[in-house]
Amino acid sequence: MKNYSKNATYLITVLLFSFVAMLLIIPSKCEAVSNDMQPLEARSADLVPEPRYIIDVPPRCPPGSKFIKNRCRVIVP
């Protein structure tokens, strides 16, 4: 008879744990769905603007040299 009560206690513990986990997970999912259902104007304020990409322009080298590996190198004829 003891074995049945042990199994019942284990089953109740597992069910209680899963119920608490569902209570914690479901509200966050509902919040995400309700956030998606907002109009785009309301959500655009939450978005972080993307940084503009800076084009890396190599510096101008003096005549007779070329820009090689991030520095100006003199080309010997």
From Swiss-Prot:
It is found in: Secreted. Pfam families: Secapin. GO terms for cellular component: extracellular region. Residues 1-32 form the signal peptide. Expressed by the venom gland. Disulfide bonds join C61-C72. It comes from the Eukaryota. Keywords: Disulfide bond, Secreted, Signal. Residues 33-52 form a propeptide. Nontoxic peptide. Belongs to the secapin family. This is Secapin.
